[in-house]
Amino acid sequence: MSESVHQRLEELKESLHYHAVRYYVEDNPEIPDAEYDRLMRELLEIEAQHPDLVTVDSPSQRVGGKPLSEFSQVTHEVPMLSLDNAFDDSELDSFHKRAQDRIGGESIKQYCCEPKLDGLAVSLLYENGILVQAATRGDGTTGENITENVRTINAIPLKLRGDDWPARLEVRGEVFMPKAGFEKLNELARQKGEKVFVNPRNAAAGSLRQLDSRITASRPLSFYAYSVGVVQGADLAASHYERFLQIKSWGLPMCPETKRVDSLADVKTYYQHILQRRDALPYEIDGVVIKIDDIAVQERLGFVARAPRWAIAYKFPAQEEITTLNEVEFQVGRTGAITPVAKLEPVFVGGVTVSNATLHNADEIERLQVKIGDQVVIRRAGDVIPQVVSVIKERRPETARDIIFPTQCPVCGSHVERIEGEAVTRCTGGLVCQAQRKQALKHFVSRKALDVDGLGDKVIEQLVDREMVETPADLFKLSAGVLTVLERMGPKSAQNIVNALEKSKLTTLPRFLYSLGIREVGEATAANLAQHFKSLEAIQAATEEQLIAVQDIGVVVAKHITTFFEEEQNQAVVQDLLVQGIHWPEVSAPEQGAELPLEGKTVVLTGTLSQLGRTEAKEALQSLGAKVTGSVSKKTDILFAGENAGSKLAKAQELGIEIKTEQDLLELIN
């Protein structure tokens, strides 16, 4: 190999890196696409003739390589934190005041503001200017190694520009799919008859988590940096915004809407400006991220419950759109509740295409005065089920029809009833009703109930449709041979379900009570019942007066419990479950004189836990003597906060409630 070949290869790499930054980062290309393609072809030809010269930072590595069998795990040297949320100006004001109070009342003026991109957070690690590792955020402590996939994203430099970067530099940012690329990707999928993506965020996440990086390379992904993690070998600027400029000078893209402002009032102006421009921006956003600009102040403020005290996400209000209500269907739930569902002309709102929305109940239909054929306003906020919020009556067509609530169950034909004082109309068919049967069985095997692994919704639906099961006890009478008649059910999968059912027979009394699906008996109520009565027999025999003596049980819930156990059909199901081998350890009372660490404390769990399931955490807290509730109030003693803790955490901070982490909970348990 001649020296000239090696030299030409380096020239091509430098040139391609330079022009990639001009195109993808600065949006200011110097050469036509055809010239860039010519340079890339020349590079590929040289590397094909001299494979020993191929390096990880070569532009040729963006095409993707051999598929992986699985992603390896990466432990973040500096945890990747989530953000607290603000939903209005008063919550933003509270954030500002808390920060100033914590640093002794000093004035905080400058903030760095940027759109909150709706994508996937990633960490990029550069060593000596070369991209050596990329990882997802995961649970904030551990993520997945997606280096091969990230190398295919043109907006991310494989080699940093310049030479004044730190020897080790970790850049955090968001991988996203621009709106235009998302539309093209879905259009191509439609032409091929393939499944389309629901929204750009799902498309970006799905593309980034492909085991075959060649698929990722074919997807229109982009990237904007938003912060740094590990920094070794050089000092960065003392301003968050100026750090952005440093990162950009090394070839990493930053969102062009990022701005430094000089007052809290300017922050609010920026928020309104971005909110108004939201639909015009080429990418999906769901709010604005606001960070105190002074790095020294950031360091003084520190972190709380896996979120920084110096930053907050100011979320946009729920998105609304107008569409046509074409029809109304009535769905039957586990407890017989009949819910009217609006069938809509599909409309893109809140980041997804919506074709169904809840109308809640007959009272809501009356309140809205909505009719079939009306133009309606629907709202979708985050993961909340879309709902009809108003009717544009001046647009009502002459053909509009009244919505008639059924007098018979739309599934089984049983009589429906509405108890005085309740908003819900219910089917009286019980387990005779196929819809109720399906939902009851799904609830019985769910994670918080008997937790039967592998027995998903589609399997339950087939079992009921084929009349193979009627009650929960029938599940334990199934054999692997019988299960193999179901669609997509091989012998191994069938045996796994049988094994999982056998394993689930050992449970706890609270889980068993919860699995029965008694109206308004959730996890906490089931735990309180078990702790108070100690046995199933005592609960079955309890009067309403005795039940009301249990913590958090009132007249209505007590009536539901006694009614459930008085019904002969329910008695038979419970007895059959016990005959099939469902059992649990004896519920023991705390030892006399034993002091539980959380005795008498009211606690709330919020956010995502990395090492404990939510049910497991609740049970652990209750075993420590705590009363676990679902909302924060002045009566709350402790808030245990995991990742992505939002409004509950903010409210707890405002009320001065003690805040603990998942690690604190683990230490209490151990």
UniProtKB/Swiss-Prot annotation:
This is DNA ligase. It holds the Pfam family HHH_5. One of its GO terms (biological process) is DNA replication. Residues 593-670 form the BRCT domain. Its cofactor is Mg(2+); Mn(2+). It catalyses: NAD(+) + (deoxyribonucleotide)n-3'-hydroxyl + 5'-phospho-(deoxyribonucleotide)m = (deoxyribonucleotide)n+m + AMP + beta-nicotinamide D-nucleotide. NAD(+) binds at D33, A34, E35, Y36, D37, S82, L83, E114, R137, E174, K291, K315. Zn(2+) binds at C409, C412, C427, C433. The gene is ligA. Disulfide bonds: none annotated. Its EC number is 6.5.1.2. The active site is at K116 (n6-amp-lysine intermediate). DNA ligase that catalyzes the formation of phosphodiester linkages between 5'-phosphoryl and 3'-hydroxyl groups in double-stranded DNA using NAD as a coenzyme and as the energy source for the reaction. It is essential for DNA replication and repair of damaged DNA.
